[in-house]
Regions:
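Catalytic loop of the DD-peptidase/beta-lactamase superfamily, centered on the K-T-G motif
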Residues: 1-70, 77, 81, 193, ...
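Short, surface-exposed loop or secondary-structure junction motifs
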Residues: 120-318
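Short, glycine/proline-biased beta-turn/loop segments that scaffold the active-site neighborhood
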Residues: 104-118
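Helix N-cap/coil-helix junction residues
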Residues: 54, 102-103, 198, 214
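Glycine/charged-rich beta-loop-alpha catalytic/anionic-binding loops adjacent to active sites
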Residues: 70-78, 167-174
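Active-site SXXK
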Residues: 59, 65, 80-106, 188-193, ...
């Protein structure tokens, strides 16, 4: 089930990120031979990596015994784009705001932000059941996305928080069934920011990153907020691409982090760390069906081949691919990131299986 769900997600993502490489096809980067950290994990990465352009890889393996890191050309301090794994942090913000009474899960987004006639609730936004399309469907919006992808630039950079809310108001709302939506996740984050009277990046820092000690993680929102030497990645065809900061769409995929910080995040979820501000189960536990999986607040849960389950989210930008997967029963998690758009989903699942067998 999990591989079917991942195949659907990968196919949908490919329609966006592969556009950036269809015109120019330089020689693709090759996988680094520079092993870092734990030699066994570095060898797992080298052995299990799939096809596609590869450059650097890094992994964190979390078990009850602690955290191990390994990489090829990157280590636990290397800054990366985590893409849609950001959505799980936005969902955690929702759970916290709901627990504190600022919002209710069943509140329509329109109760807290100007989204016109859009009727979806905050819970529906967090579970991709709001009826919003994956991306804004206006001709101008679609054209700007296509041009950015062909240029290898951030396709979301021109859309502010106000634009995101406008796009929700203008959208033709579909049925309230599961349909993955970047627009929906962005609307959720910007609506919560309105309700809390903060910018999204500040709200994320105050409610999630600082409490968990994720000091190397941020949502810069604009290219101007990045240092000049901020790392960037490569398309699936090996073309250098710009960083994604995503502006108003930051709640859907704009976070930059490190393997060390993402290991802290996974540990907090596996151990029900009070610093989360809510029980981990409030976001992780499945609530609805989701294309062969089940979905909680931002998190997918799928059956594993050994009869257990995997709770996960993946992420992809024009230049990075990410997988964060957890075996909650064994208290094991794996974070994997590569600085190309070639998927690391299967790599992450294989590493989780290896780690689970050793735990």
């Amino acid at each position: 089930m999990i591989r079917r769900r991942l195949a659907l997600a990968a196919a949908s993502a490919a329609a966006v990120v592969l556009l950036g490489g269809v015109l120019l096809r330089p020689s693709a980067p090759t996988l680094s031979t520079e092993a870092t950290g734990d030699a066994e994990i570095a060898e797992w990465l080298r052995t299990d990596v799939g096809d596609g352009a590869r450059n650097h890889l890094v992994a964190a393996v979390v078990t009850p015994d602690g955290v191990r890191y390994g990489g090829l050309g990157a280590d636990e301090r290397t800054e990366v784009e985590i893409g849609s794994v950001t959505k799980t942090m936005t969902a955690l913000l929702l759970a916290r705001s709901a627990a504190e009474g600022t919002v209710g899960l069943e509140d329509p987004a329109a109760d807290h932000a100007d989204v016109g006639g859009f009727t979806g609730t905050l819970e529906e936004l967090a579970t991709h059941r709001s009826g919003l399309p994956r991306l804004p469907a206006g001709i101008g919006d679609l054209a700007s996305t296509l041009v950015a992808q062909l240029r290898g630039t951030d396709p979301y950079a021109g859309w502010s928080a106000d634009d995101v809310l406008r796009q929700a108001a203008d959208a033709d709302q579909g049925e309230h069934v599961h349909a993955y939506s970047n627009l929906g996740a962005a609307v959720l984050g910007q609506t919560l920011a309105r309700a809390e009277g903060r910018d999204y990046a500040d709200l994320l820092r105050e409610r999630v990153l600082d409490p968990l000690g994720m000091t190397a993680t941020s949502a810069p929102e604009t290219a101007d907020a990045l240092p000049a030497d901020a790392p960037t990645g490569f398309s699936a065809t090996g073309r250098p691409v710009d960083a994604w900061t995503m502006a108003g769409y930051a709640p859907a995929g704009g976070v930059r982090s490190t393997a060390a910080d993402m290991a802290r995040y996974a540990q907090a979820l596996l151990t029900d760390d009070p610093a989360l501000g809510v029980p981990a189960a409030s976001v992780l536990d499945p609530r609805f069906d989701a294309d062969g999986a089940r979905i909680g607040l931002g998190w997918f849960t799928s059956e594993s081949e050994d009869g257990g389950s995997v709770t996960w989210h993946n992420g992809g930008t024009s230049g990075y691919s990410t997988m964060l997967a957890m075996d909650r029963e064994r208290s094991v998690a794996v974070f994997v990131n590569g600085d190309t758009a070639s998927s690391v989903d299967e790599l992450g699942l294989r590493l989780l299986e290896r780690a689970g067998e050793e735990s």
